Amino acid sequence: MIIRALPLIALFVLINFSLGYAQKIFQADSPDEASVRVFAVEEPEQADLWVCFVWEESEITRTGLWMDMRFSREADVIIYFVDEEKDANLKIWLVDTIEESKWINDAKKSLLQIKSPEK
């Protein structure tokens, strides 16, 4: 039974990653190095995205699940956490479980879209 499900699981993962939304992040040392400036809000209704940090690459199954990478070259997106909400272009609420992660403000999805390499 599990062997039959493997192609479906592989297809699901492939489709999910082909949607082009970054999940591997690197935290820059300065805002000039980042493509997205992030602010962690104090209330969930203030957020654009509810984020859950994961520890294993295999856990990255959808948007809102972020894995903090050690090196910028490993990341899909480089972020910088700002101190003031007004300086952010993405506001996040940190959640405890994978199931809670989700977009609240769909208009902000393009901030985490992976750009296709130019030919």
Set out the residue ranges of the language-model regions.
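Sec-dependent N-terminal signal peptides
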Residues: 5-15
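Repetitive, compositionally biased segments used for assembly/scaffolding
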Residues: 21-119
